[in-house]
Swiss-Prot record:
Residues 8-22 have a biased composition (Low complexity). A motif (Nuclear localization signal (NLS1)) lies at residues 338-350. It is found in: Cytoplasm; Nucleus. Its main location: cytoplasm. A motif (nuclear export sequence (NES2)) lies at residues 568-577. This is Nuclear receptor subfamily 4 group A member 2. CDD domains: NR_DBD_NGFI-B (cd06969), NR_LBD_Nurr1 (cd07071).
Length: 598
């Protein structure tokens, strides 16, 4: 098949197709001055998004927008297509045009009817070196000049069907079809054939004006190409499939666990914030119950227990302290006064509040219980040597013996009760005169209260501070009618089922109270308020006081009864002094004189 090559010649701008001259060279080459730069371009500006086709590969303009801003008027360029196996050429044929011919409509010609002299082939270049999917620029340029077309694959024939759907009557790529050339075609030449009338719009013109060019044959030799000014690696089908198969890393899902979605207290999953801090539902409920009930917890270790999802329920004290440490606000928790509406944060104080000491009521009640236990005889060391349950015993013996026994029991209890008072936190810090006044004023009250709590009024057993156990009838002649009031008070006290913690607070309040003649009554009042708050917290949340209304009031109501019993004791001592059967001990006599109201 003869190869005809077109040689470029100069032509004035705007020359019409009829004014062009054509000449054949002796070598069989065909020269034409017809190809003006405008026609050579034939509107195949690859930066135009109209040429791109919707395929499985990324849009062609996506690549071109990043590497070029436009094309200048240049000679026709070559498509390079890396192929595996034997090298083949691409044949460009005319595809019949529809609805755009002004003068005549030529029927499509079959491949056999086309003259061989008009066949033109594109010779593909050798396959480039495989590159990474990143499409990095290689040192050996794949394009010979900036105006060259991008790599095409054989399957891109289907793009003509997509472009035919454009709004304009002519599809630019519809002018071409691609087929493989016979093997052995020289690589150095590029041939192209136009069969039939070719109508290419050069500039924006009215729809009725067109450039009509008869089908001609020309060739573009390789040597006339300009040196490459830009390198761009070829887009291989294998690389494109790898790009499409590669999964783009998606952002973490909204519900995936992260540090922002963990509870600040135990580390469990937390959906939102509660009381100012992102916490889980478990820690939110624990904090709410603790604040609403004003509960006080005790740490059995060193107040540094680990608080996590698995061990958060082991130590309530450390868990609540961590809730406060991470910033949970107690004032936001709804109380009875905020019932029916959400709590709101109070306004910020002008000066930062000083942090309260770590749970002082807990340490106070523990000290009170310890002082009570140390000042009471053990149940295994009680002295039953003088105990007799004989109803006739009150009639036997001398009165002086019973009176002396009465004085001995009082003096024996006095030293034990004083030792108990010295162990009360804060009592030893008071002035010595106030300590003596408080103790002497409350001695008889403490004597009756402790005796009533230890004794068993049902069996008539009275257990004194020194461990001596006597029957109620054995004390009648020494105590007189006072013993009956003590037993009755003991019965009422036993029926209240007071635990040892509440009783320790009641005993301390019986002594730490306002007395006439105190040197520093304010300090006494502060200590009294601490004990009252300690008793209130304990009774309300720790020993079933929630199920018994007015339980705290009933406990505090025992203190006035003790005052009445103390008055009865003073009357008994006064009566024994008047009787003068047995002289009272000096400490009892001083106690009597100091506690007289006149």
């Amino acid at each position: 098949m003869p190869c005809v090559q077109a040689q470029y010649g100069s032509s004035p701008q705007g020359a019409s197709p009829a004014s062009q001259s054509y000449s054949y060279h002796s070598s069989g080459e065909y020269s034409s001055d017809f190809l003006t730069p405008e026609f050579v371009k034939f509107s195949m500006d690859l930066t135009n998004t109209e040429i791109t086709a919707t395929t499985s590969l990324p849009s062609f303009s996506t690549f071109m927008d990043n590497y070029s801003t436009g094309y200048d008027v240049k000679p026709p360029c070559l498509y390079q297509m890396p192929l595996s196996g034997q090298q083949s050429s691409i044949k460009v044929e005319d595809i019949q045009m529809h609805n755009y011919q002004q003068h005549s409509h030529l029927p499509p010609q079959s491949e056999e009817m086309m003259p061989h002299s008009g066949s033109v082939y594109y010779k593909p270049s050798s396959p480039p070196t495989p590159t990474t999917p990143g499409f990095q620029v290689q040192h050996s340029p794949m394009w010979d000049d900036p105006g060259s077309l991008h790599n095409f694959h054989q399957n891109y024939v289907a793009t003509t069907h997509m472009i035919e759907q454009r709004k304009t009557p002519v599809s630019r790529l519809s002018l071409f079809s691609f087929k493989q050339s016979p093997p052995g075609t020289p690589v150095s030449s590029c041939q192209m054939r136009f069969d039939g009338p070719l109508h290419v719009p050069m500039n924006p013109e009215p729809a009725g004006s067109h450039h009509v060019v008869d089908g001609q044959t020309f060739a573009v030799p390789n040597p006339i190409r300009k040196p490459a000014s830009m390198g761009f690696p070829g887009l291989q089908i294998g690389h494109a499939s790898q790009l499409l198969d590669t999964q783009v890393p998606s952002p973490p899902s909204r519900g995936s666990p992260s540090n922002e979605g963990l509870c600040a207290v135990c580390g469990d999953n937390a959906a939102c914030q509660h009381y100012g801090v992102r916490t889980c539902e478990g820690c939110k409920g624990f904090f709410k119950r603790t604040v609403q009930k004003n509960a006080k917890y005790v740490c059995l270790a060193n107040k540094n227990c680990p608080v996590d999802k698995r061990r958060r329920n082991r130590c309530q004290y450390c868990r609540f302290q961590k809730c406060l440490a991470v910033g949970m606000v107690k004032e936001v928790v709804r109380t009875d006064s905020l019932k029916g509406r959400r709590g709101r944060l109070p306004s910020k104080p002008k000066s930062p509040q000083e942090p309260s000491p770590p749970s002082p009521p807990v340490s106070l009640i523990s000290a009170l219980v310890r002082a009570h236990v140390d000042s009471n005889p053990a149940m295994t060391s009680l002295d039953y040597s003088r105990f007799q349950a004989n109803p006739d015993y009150q009639m036997s013996g001398d009165d002086t013996q019973h009176i002396q026994q009465f004085y001995d029991l009082l003096t024996g209890s006095m030293e034990i009760i004083r030792g108990w008072a010295e162990k009360i936190p804060g009592f030893a810090d008071l002035p010595k005169a106030d300590q003596d006044l408080l103790f002497e004023s409350a001695f008889l009250e403490l004597f009756v209260l402790r005796l009533a709590y230890r004794s068993n009024p049902v069996e008539g057993k009275l257990i004194f501070c020194n461990g001596v156990v006597l029957h109620r009838l054995q004390c009648v002649r020494g105590f007189g009618e006072w013993i009956d009031s003590i037993v009755e008070f003991s019965s009422n006290l036993q029926n209240m089922n007071i635990d040892i913690s509440a009783f320790s607070c009641i005993a301390a309040l019986a002594m730490v109270t306002e007395r006439h003649g105190l040197k520093e009554p304010k300090r006494v009042e502060e200590l009294q308020n601490k004990i009252v708050n300690c008793l209130k917290d304990h009774v309300t949340f720790n020993n079933g006081g929630l199920n018994r209304p007015n339980y705290l009031s009933k406990l505090l109501g025992k203190l006035p009864e003790l005052r009445t019993l103390c008055t009865q004791g003073l009357q008994r001592i006064f009566y024994l002094k008047l009787e003068d059967l047995v002289p009272p001990p000096a400490i009892i006599d001083k106690l009597f004189l100091d506690t007289l109201p006149f």
